[in-house]
Every structure is written in C-alpha cells, then in structure tokens.
C-alpha cells in the first residue's frame, strides 16, 4: 500500500450491497477531514476495478461520524501557514452509506476529482507567483533603502545579480 498523487491509484473499495454502499480501505490523505467544521467527507474509491482506468472510481458523501471510520494520524502540510489544517490518514472498515450518497453516478469519481483539482492547480500557481512578485518588490525596496559602507545596496553588483536571479526564477 502506498500513497499516490495519481487519482486512479486509489485502492479504497466501494461495493454496492442492496440499498447501501460499503467502503473498505485506507485513505492516505484526506483534506480537512479533522477540522472542526467537517461534518461530511467526499470519499473517492474504486467501485468497478474492471472498468477502464478513468471510470473505475466513484465519489460518495460520508458523514464524518459514520461507524467504521478510524482516524490513524493527523498529517502536516509542508510550508503551509495553516498546517496542520485538518488533513489526516483514515481507515474505513465496513462503512455503510445509502446509495443516494453517490455523487453523479458510479464511475464518475475521477471526473469529479479532476474538475476540482485542475482549477485548483491554477489558483495555487497564481497565489505563489503573486507571493514571489511581492517578495521581489520588497527586496528591491530594501536594496534601495539600505545603506552599507556608504553606498546603497542597490548599487552593489552582487546585490544586483541576486535581484536579477530572483526575477528570473
């Protein structure tokens, strides 16, 4: 068992049993599931292993207090200002939810995940580019204001090189 950023690698099983789905397996990374406001989790798992790769998974709504959900450990997010933000590893053992908790239909889990993750990647990229631009602005302001050995830092070649390298990166 391994964690993976490939959404098609999820091993948690979602099996239909009459009017319910039964969930069994491990979720290595569950975002915000231990936050105090989390009452319902969106859980993606493999519901049809014989289907084409991108149609094997489904997503179901699972109330956080459903019997059979075990918190294994909280996880930290590297470089996050809000870490730990509620991310955790869970085990699901015979967790039962009504068939009506299926989102969009069986086999639509990957589509749902990509619909959220795709735009999210752009949002994070824009956020970090903005942060980098602000850091560059602050560096330039500081180099212009700070005087060392009778000269502004902005006049020193080594500082100019560092600013230029930062702009290129």
Please give the residue ranges for each predicted region.
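A gly/ser-rich beta-alpha-beta helix-loop segment of oxidoreductase catalytic cores
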Residues: 1-15
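A generic structural signal for beta-strand entry/edge sites
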Residues: 18-22, 40, 87-89
């Amino acid at each position: 068992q391994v964690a993976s950023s490939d959404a098609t690698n999820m091993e948690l099983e979602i099996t239909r049993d009459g009017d319910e789905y039964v969930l069994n397996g491990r979720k290595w990374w569950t975002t915000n599931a231990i936050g105090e406001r989390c009452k319902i989790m969106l859980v993606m798992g493999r519901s049809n292993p014989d289907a084409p790769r991108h149609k094997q998974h489904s997503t179901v709504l699972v109330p956080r207090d459903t019997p059979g959900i075990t918190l294994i450990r909280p996880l930290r997010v590297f470089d996050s200002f809000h870490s730990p933000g509620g991310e955790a590893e869970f085990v699901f053992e015979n967790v039962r939810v009504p068939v009506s908790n299926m989102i969009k239909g069986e086999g639509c889990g990957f589509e749902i995940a990509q619909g959220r993750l795709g735009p999210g990647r752009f949002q994070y990229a824009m956020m970090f580019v903005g942060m980098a631009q602000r850091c560059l602005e602050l560096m330039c302001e500081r180099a212009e204001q700070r005087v060392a050995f009778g000269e502004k830092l902005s006049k020193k070649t080594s500082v100019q090189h560092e600013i230029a390298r930062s702009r290129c990166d």
